[in-house]
């Protein structure tokens, strides 16, 4: 697009909310699958459907995911790498961005960050539902953006899940 040509974007960072998660989660992979437990905002509820028929089975984030988490933790913000963006809207957005980068903008990097509920969103939810203040979420995103700008490649550190 014209905006991409004018600004020579280097990275795309998408942000979505994952209510129930207790910290910031930086997504590592998006899969080519839509399967919604509930309808989306347009009332659509896909079942076992590929996002793109001509797309790869999955795309890995090309942002420095582990560096982003490291910067957030250094700022005392709960954060971790996530290995599933789910099969709902957030995964769909991440997948489509990485597909577009793969097909049209190979010079760009892209990825996705999930943020928790805000405290005021949990008022009518079960006691103990995780949340995070908006100021901390904003600081986490600042840390993530700084990591993207300062790190062309990711750090080599262990961050895998046991299950």
Locate each region found by the language model:
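Structural motif
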Residues: 11-13
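Active-site-adjacent mobile loop/cap segments within catalytic or ligand-binding domains
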Residues: 95-146
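SAM-dependent methyltransferases
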Residues: 142, 148-163
């Amino acid at each position: 697009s014209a905006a991409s040509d004018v600004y020579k974007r280097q990275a795309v960072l998408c942000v979505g909310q994952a209510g129930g998660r207790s910290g910031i989660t930086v997504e590592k992979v998006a899969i080519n699958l839509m399967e919604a437990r509930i309808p989306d905002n347009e009332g659509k509820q896909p079942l076992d459907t590929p996002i793109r028929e001509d797309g790869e089975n999955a795309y890995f984030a090309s942002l420095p995911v582990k560096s982003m988490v490291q910067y957030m933790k250094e700022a005392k913000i709960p954060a971790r790498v996530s290995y599933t963006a789910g099969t709902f809207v957030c995964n769909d957005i991440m997948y489509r961005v990485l597909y577009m980068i793969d097909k049209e903008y190979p010079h760009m990097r892209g990825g996705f960050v999930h943020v928790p509920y805000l405290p005021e969103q949990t008022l009518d939810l079960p006691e103990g539902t995780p949340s995070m203040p908006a100021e901390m979420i904003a600081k986490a995103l600042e840390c993530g953006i700084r990591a993207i700008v300062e790190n062309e490649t990711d750090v080599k550190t262990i961050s895998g899940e046991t299950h």
